[in-house]
């Protein structure tokens, strides 16, 4: 028998869905499509019409249950590439996350959601609330169909609660760990898998090609699911589409380490590309932000310098002859014909050197600022190898 709380939660969800079903027409257009009435910003996600749901496999240090991936976030990409972030400061919540429990539990009475967030939406450094606040401020404020103006009877913080509820509801529909295990892909300190095996296992359940990210040990690190969406995101009419990002994983030899296992006896080292039997640490992390010495800001996913917003997470993989290859969500990172650091799906894998926490290319560890695009807080500046004629700095790794 359903508990009183369960019945109440079901009624709330039903009323909310009915409210938005009546607000948005049945023939609401699909995001990234020009068919239908695309003028209603409360019933059409635009221009960020590609919806991503992303999950982590944090095995060392371990985060979340041993038999589950954990939540990263929901966010939207532009249909033409790139993504919005921190779209409306007036909608942001306290960056420490100090108000989230009060919103979810005290204001909206959803202790179950809050408990599940603490179980499955975990920060690797243990600061869950700050992580959740960051994700809402960066991504939740960019979902135009979640804007308070779209609610017929808006209650304060309702969009915040709905964002966290939507994230967890979609997570429940994407049991990545169970899908992999059912296909014979199980956490192991010795077994490896092919990219085709992993992609096929997930595609057979999801219905479209999924993005797989690997760390520098060639171990599964993250999984991204891509959608278009019909109508308001609150209606949850998600339409799976193939990934628009290029994997950084090898075609074979991909590892799926059990959580809590360092993998030191079986995983490839980050510095030499060889196998170690010890537990000694290596100097290049699996993932990192890239900062500029003496400057605020950091590099974003296309390789440009940005003074506001959030730093991109870069992945570091063993290259040839002890070098390191770098990737971002945009693809491989390399040096273009103008000696600029760049990352894209069309960039070839490039060998960099990482020494003392700094990044170099062909022995040159000095970098300079180049051309600027945009203006003000949205300005992006290219970063290029120093030729000795400019004020140089180092590109350094940071967590």
Swiss-Prot record:
<dbReference type="InterPro" id="IPR033130">
    <property type="entry name" value="RNase_T2_His_AS_2"/>
</dbReference>
<dbReference type="Pfam" id="PF00445">
    <property type="entry name" value="Ribonuclease_T2"/>
</dbReference>
<dbReference type="InterPro" id="IPR001568">
    <property type="entry name" value="RNase_T2-like"/>
</dbReference>
<keyword id="KW-0325">Glycoprotein</keyword>
<protein>
    <recommendedName>
        <fullName>Ribonuclease T2-like 1-A</fullName>
        <ecNumber>4.6.1.19</ecNumber>
    </recommendedName>
</protein>
<dbReference type="GO" id="GO:0005576">
    <property type="term" value="C:extracellular region"/>
</dbReference>
<dbReference type="InterPro" id="IPR033697">
    <property type="entry name" value="Ribonuclease_T2_eukaryotic"/>
</dbReference>
<keyword id="KW-0732">Signal</keyword>
<feature type="glycosylation site" description="N-linked (GlcNAc...) asparagine">
    <location>
        <position position="291"/>
    </location>
</feature>
<feature type="active site">
    <location>
        <position position="72"/>
    </location>
</feature>
<dbReference type="GO" id="GO:0005775">
    <property type="term" value="C:vacuolar lumen"/>
</dbReference>
<dbReference type="InterPro" id="IPR036430">
    <property type="entry name" value="RNase_T2-like_sf"/>
</dbReference>
<feature type="disulfide bond">
    <location>
        <begin position="42"/>
        <end position="150"/>
    </location>
</feature>
<keyword id="KW-0963">Cytoplasm</keyword>
<keyword id="KW-0255">Endonuclease</keyword>
<comment type="similarity">
    <text>Belongs to the RNase T2 family.</text>
</comment>
<comment type="function">
    <text>Rnase which modulates cell survival under stress conditions. Released from the vacuole to the cytoplasm during stress to promote tRNA and rRNA cleavage and to activate separately a downstream pathway that promotes cell death. Involved in cell size, vacuolar morphology and growth at high temperatures and high salt concentration.</text>
</comment>
<keyword id="KW-0456">Lyase</keyword>
<feature type="disulfide bond">
    <location>
        <begin position="87"/>
        <end position="142"/>
    </location>
</feature>
<feature type="region of interest" description="Disordered">
    <location>
        <begin position="259"/>
        <end position="279"/>
    </location>
</feature>
<feature type="disulfide bond">
    <location>
        <begin position="214"/>
        <end position="249"/>
    </location>
</feature>
<feature type="active site">
    <location>
        <position position="139"/>
    </location>
</feature>
<dbReference type="GO" id="GO:0006401">
    <property type="term" value="P:RNA catabolic process"/>
</dbReference>
<feature type="compositionally biased region" description="Low complexity">
    <location>
        <begin position="262"/>
        <end position="279"/>
    </location>
</feature>
<dbReference type="GO" id="GO:0003723">
    <property type="term" value="F:RNA binding"/>
</dbReference>
<feature type="disulfide bond">
    <location>
        <begin position="32"/>
        <end position="79"/>
    </location>
</feature>
<feature type="active site">
    <location>
        <position position="135"/>
    </location>
</feature>
<keyword id="KW-1015">Disulfide bond</keyword>
<dbReference type="GO" id="GO:0004521">
    <property type="term" value="F:RNA endonuclease activity"/>
</dbReference>
<keyword id="KW-0926">Vacuole</keyword>
<keyword id="KW-0540">Nuclease</keyword>
<feature type="disulfide bond">
    <location>
        <begin position="24"/>
        <end position="43"/>
    </location>
</feature>
<keyword id="KW-0378">Hydrolase</keyword>
<feature type="signal peptide">
    <location>
        <begin position="1"/>
        <end position="17"/>
    </location>
</feature>
<dbReference type="GO" id="GO:0033897">
    <property type="term" value="F:ribonuclease T2 activity"/>
</dbReference>
<dbReference type="Pfam" id="PF25488">
    <property type="entry name" value="RNaseT2L_C"/>
</dbReference>
